[in-house]
């Protein structure tokens, strides 16, 4: 019993008798408010604990030889789809000219609304032309390429075949009205119909994981003496408006929290024949999710430069939108991790202890202030 008596001397929380405890309305109010605040702070701390934190690390990138996927969604409000070509090339010498297999073009009217097939038929009906039916021709025919025949292309049964044969020869496609295939397909008329339209280009490119560029430019592209050129003879340089809106551009898949700096970028060309260049630095990124899933993608930074691509008015060059990218030799690894449970417990204890302490101080202040005021009131009554 003597030992228990000595132990009681270390009690930091001495108790008072129930008869000496005073309960007040002010104390009840402070208790309820502090309890609600404590609950809100606890829920906030719990929500923070349930989220994951991301730890970044930096490594040398050794993953060469892979393919790089470029996701594209760009609108050109004043450049018809029939005039626009998309090309990609890299420092290894690989070229993709007038890419079509994974990229799609959608015609837009002057208000930016997609042109439906019903609208196309309506436009054709307005000028009362006979729609060309390719099934009406002999499937075994072999038509002329107008001197552009090669070992790969011996027959040109459509206007596009003739254009491709000309492109491979490095010839300019000057006057389609002199070519029977283009005349019967109404090539010139289609070009005229789309003159005031815009174009949306969307899809993806797969390129080698080396430095390179891809661009959107008017005219049919081809190689001539190992030089990449575009046939602009059917355009007036004063009519090329490269105003564009980059809805989305990314290199690889998106991961939580990624920021693509070119998304929703709207650029208005101040004059005709503008050349816009985007210099992009691609940083390979590995994102490891907390469940073990590994996502290999890329981040990038960008700088824009623009100039007039008209030899008479400015520097030499080609009107269009060019994205020139190079890859960083470093790789960023982002790892998701659960937050520390001990940190959560520490936070909860701090919330509870802090609220109890502050609530006790406020309650004591209210109680003693009320007693002091009541004493003065009672003293005034007696006098």
UniProtKB/Swiss-Prot annotation:
Record-marked site positions (Ubiquitinated): 8
Cellular component GO terms, alphabetical: endoplasmic reticulum membrane; endoplasmic reticulum-Golgi intermediate compartment; endoplasmic reticulum-Golgi intermediate compartment membrane; Golgi apparatus; retrograde transporter complex, Golgi to ER
UniProt key word Glycoprotein: yes
Keyword annotations of the record: Acetylation, Endoplasmic reticulum, ER-Golgi transport, Glycoprotein, Golgi apparatus, Membrane, Phosphoprotein, Transmembrane, Transmembrane helix, Transport
InterPro entries: Erv, Erv_C, Erv_N
Record's bilayer topology term: Multi-pass membrane protein
Claim: Phosphoprotein is one of the keywords in the record: yes
Compartments where found: Endoplasmic reticulum-Golgi intermediate compartment membrane; Golgi apparatus, cis-Golgi network membrane; Endoplasmic reticulum membrane
Side of membrane Cytoplasmic, spans: 1-25, 363-383
Region (Required for MARCHF2-mediated degradation): 1-25
Sites carrying sugar chains: 266
Membrane-spanning residues: 26-46, 342-362
Reported tissue expression: Expression is particularly strong in liver, kidney and brain but is almost undetectable in heart.
Domain of life: Eukaryota
Residues recorded with modification Phosphoserine: 116
Ranges per topology, Lumenal: 47-341
Family matches, as Pfam families: COPIIcoated_ERV (PF07970), ERGIC_N (PF13850)
Family assignment from sequence similarity: Belongs to the ERGIC family.
Quaternary context: Forms homodimers. May form a heteromeric complex composed of ERGIC1, ERGIC2 and ERGIC3. Within the complex, the interaction with ERGIC1 is direct. Interacts with ERGIC1/ERGIC32. Interacts with ERGIC2, the interaction is required for the stable expression of both proteins. Interacts with MARCHF2. Interacts with SERPINA1/alpha1-antitrypsin and HP/haptoglobin.
Task of the protein: Possible role in transport between endoplasmic reticulum and Golgi. Positively regulates trafficking of the secretory proteins alpha1-antitrypsin/SERPINA1 and HP/haptoglobin.
Name of the featured protein: Endoplasmic reticulum-Golgi intermediate compartment protein 3
